[in-house]
């Protein structure tokens, strides 16, 4: 997975991610620091999603960020 967008601009994007996934805590986002795999794991944990669903959600989020630029 190409997570350059997430890791490269994490500070700016964290607010959008928090708005999208409100069940994740500020600490979750601090630890994630743009790491897409960690973020996927937290989505699985908090939302009860399987790995594929969490990966799909993160990829869709990345795509929405690319489309915004």
UniProtKB/Swiss-Prot annotation:
SUPFAM superfamilies: Hypothetical protein YjbJ. It holds the Pfam family CsbD. InterPro entries: CsbD (IPR008462), UPF0337_stress_rsp (IPR050423), YjbJ (IPR026042), YjbJ_sf (IPR036629). Belongs to the UPF0337 (CsbD) family. This is UPF0337 protein XAC4007. It comes from Xanthomonas axonopodis pv. citri (strain 306).
């Amino acid at each position: 997975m190409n997570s350059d967008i997430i890791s490269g601009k994490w500070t700016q994007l964290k607010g959008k991610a928090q708005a999208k996934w409100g069940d994740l805590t500020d600490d979750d986002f601090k630890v994630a620091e743009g790491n897409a795999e960690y973020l996927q794991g937290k989505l699985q944990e908090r939302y009860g999603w399987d790995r594929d669903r969490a990966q799909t959600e993160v990829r869709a989020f990345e795509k929405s960020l690319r489309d915004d630029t």
